[in-house]
UniProtKB/Swiss-Prot annotation:
This is HTH-type transcriptional regulator SyrM 1. GO terms for molecular function: DNA binding; DNA-binding transcription factor activity. It holds the Pfam family LysR_substrate. SUPFAM superfamilies: Periplasmic binding protein-like II, Winged helix' DNA-binding domain. Residues 52-72 bind DNA. Transcriptional activator that regulates the expression of genes involved in symbiosis. Among other targets it acts on the nolWBTUV operon. Residues 35-92 form the HTH lysR-type domain. Belongs to the LysR transcriptional regulatory family. Keywords: Activator, DNA-binding, Nodulation, Plasmid, Transcription, Transcription regulation. Gene3D superfamilies: Periplasmic binding protein-like II, Winged helix-like DNA-binding domain superfamily/Winged helix DNA-binding domain.
Length: 338
């Protein structure tokens, strides 16, 4: 029985090295050295058209150039590849095998040059940082678009908005209130919104001629994540105007707040799009706040590492289209109230 190979200074076993040599290996190296991308493209065109003149026209080359490429291909593969038949050139059996192997090779090379994919063939997961009160606004119009245009794309939303996670590639996009994009990031405005108040249907305050007379006396609800997202400052503004109690009832998210308001006399101040979504699901009434509040702007943020990626660019455009749909919906709602 043969002993394991070992060196002269150690008893450790070493894996024997397999050395590929001989005429066949040399022939393979010579064939690879003789092939280039232009030659493979010529082979593709010749197998498709089975006519040197038509293949040359397809490639934008002269007929003699394609004829020379065919001669070179015959030498590389040691096969005629295309022979004359009664109705034109006919591929040999070896050419037919090459015709089956060639498309995925060239498709891979083309993908290196143009990495954009057909979104209908996507099998990817897009991760977006999006607070829940933005998710209930954007996802209803966005998800049907994705189901139609990119049915295999998975969407995962995260409530945390963190620029560091964008930079490290943990998430792809972030949606929220960002005034200016920091260095290394890009920003696109999605929509502007104004604030509204949510009360339960039948709330005693709705019987008053002006809600401002009772607004400051009402018990308020607030979203616990407001201070992290940005519109918590509206709560502070109302407190300064003595229009909101300084210690509101904190709830974890917008839908929970809506359920709390339905069964109590609490009032919640949120962006109007959020209020509209909640009122569509629950017996709630939307009223204007007692004073004019600063507008609420929602933006899309991404890191520069993804800025030129064609798939990422496509996804950003689809999110912007969904945001535009919410603006059109707001216009329709406003017209119906007039």
């Amino acid at each position: 029985m043969d002993e394991p190979a070992c060196n002269g200074t150690s008893n450790e076993w070493q894996r024997p090295q397999l050395i590929v040599a001989g005429p066949r290996a040399a022939r393979r190296r010579q064939m690879l050295a003789s092939l280039d991308l232009n030659t493979l493209l010529a082979l593709e065109a010749l197998l498709e058209h089975r006519n040197v003149t038509q293949a040359a026209r397809h490639l934008g080359l002269s007929q003699p150039s394609v004829s020379r490429a065919l001669i070179r291909l015959r030498g590389v593969f040691n096969d005629d590849l295309l022979v004359r038949g009664s109705s034109g050139m006919v591929p040999t059996p070896h050419a037919q095998r090459l015709g089956q192997m060639l498309p995925p090779v060239l498709d891979s090379i083309r993908g290196m040059v143009d990495p954009g994919l057909d979104q209908g063939e996507w099998r990817l997961t897009a991760r977006m940082a999006m607070p829940d009160h933005q998710a209930i606004v954007l996802l209803p119009p966005f998800l049907p678009l994705m189901r139609e245009r990119a049915p295999n794309l998975d969407i995962v939303t995260d409530s945390l908005l963190a620029l560091r996670r964008l930079e490290q590639g943990e998430i792809d996009l972030a949606v929220g209130q960002i005034g200016e994009a920091p260095p290394g990031y890009f920003r696109r405005r999605l929509y502007n919104d104004r604030f509204a108040c949510l009360l339960r249907n039948g709330h005693p305050a709705l019987e008053q001629e002006s809600i401002i007379d009772t607004f400051s006396a009402l018990r308020h609800a607030a979203i616990a994540s407001d201070t992290k997202d940005g519109f918590g400052r509206v709560h502070d503004d109302l407190v300064k105007l003595d229009l909101q109690d300084p210690d509101p009832v904190l709830v974890s998210n917008v839908l929970t707040a809506g359920l709390a308001i339905v069964s109590t006399d609490l009032v919640l101040v949120v962006p109007r799009r959020v209020a509209t979504r909640n009122a569509a699901l629950l017996p709630l009434v939307i009223v204007d706040p007692p004073v004019e509040l600063p507008p609420y702007e929602v933006a899309l943020i991404w890191h520069e590492r993804c800025h030129r990626d064609p798939d990422h660019r496509w996804l950003r455009q689809e999110i912007a289209a969904a945001a535009t749909a919410t603006e059109q919906g707001q216009s329709t709602d406003a017209a119906s109230r007039q």
